[in-house]
Amino acid sequence: MSTGRTHRQTYRPNQDFLTPPVSLTVSPSAPASGSAVTLTATLTNTAPVGLLGTVLYLAVNGTGRPSALGRLAPGRAATRTWRTRLADDAEGEVSFTAHALFDVGPGSSDCTRVSSSVLLPYRSLPGAFDNAGIASDDALTVADIDGSASSLSAQALAAAGLTPGAAVTYNGVTFTWPDTRPGNLDNVICSGQTVLLSGSGSRLAFLGTSTWGAGKGDGKVVYADGSEQAFSVGVPDWYGANASASVVLPYRHIATGRDDNPVSLYTFGVDLDSGKELRSLVLPKVSDGLQSGVATLHVFAMTVA
């Protein structure tokens, strides 16, 4: 950085003062899609010289507005508030950011920032998809279902009737297989996400599988009247032709190519209070994302029956 004088201050490169703290609060702390939110950020100049030409940006998912603060003297703080509205179709992770840009002398610009995020309910199961677990036999590297570059074969699935968007019935329950191409997101890793539901029925059923051992965890169904129903799942590992499987595929992909050992998909679920309208589902928290060697539960489809 260069040195110079601005507003009678001298910038010295050996002074470590280019990270003034900025704080950010979001209200309400757990907003809903389509609701109003207020972002409040405070930039405090802890440097021994003034911050020049200071601009403070407040943003939601990277989109926001700047506020010009001008010169911020040493020891002074400036607060700006922005009231905005989340999109009606907002879902999943929503990030909030406060980002300050400033100069401390000619040619000596710097910045500081802080971020936070909230996880909104997903509007549908496909909206929650965060893993690509299906690959074509001629393009194995586009998917990874277990953190070790393994995947289900699109061709083996098609031979079993599981083509994109297909309606398939197991144990009297009909599911819609993900309408996605190999390599695209096609399943959700169960990590405690919330998915909105509607309607009513006697059973909430899932079609999925587990990698690196049995996928075990606790979930929750929330009804429209505010009542809750806890449930537990224990889904066997995908490797092998399991007697309890709804679908058995003759082979899978691994990092080095085709592996001619069978893998299994399963149906599982929870019995519901059929007289109640559904509001949402909290998926079982089995893992924190995809990790090789860690039991992970994947859901490809669900239905209220």
Model-derived segments and spans:
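Terminal connector regions
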Residues: 1-15, 88-120
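Low-complexity, acidic Ser/Thr/Pro/Gly-rich terminal tails and inter-domain linkers that flank the onset
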Residues: 11-32
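N-terminal/edge-of-domain interface segments
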Residues: 14, 111-305
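Short, solvent-exposed loop/linker segments at the N-terminal edge
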Residues: 29-36, 50
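Structural beta-strand segments of beta-rich domains
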Residues: 35-39, 202
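Asparagine-centered strand-capping/turn motif at beta-strand->loop junctions
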Residues: 43-50
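Intrinsically disordered, low-complexity Pro/Gly/Ser/Thr-rich segments with frequent PxxP/GP/PP motifs
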Residues: 63-89
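Short, hydrophobic beta-strand segments
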Residues: 80-89, 98, 268-273
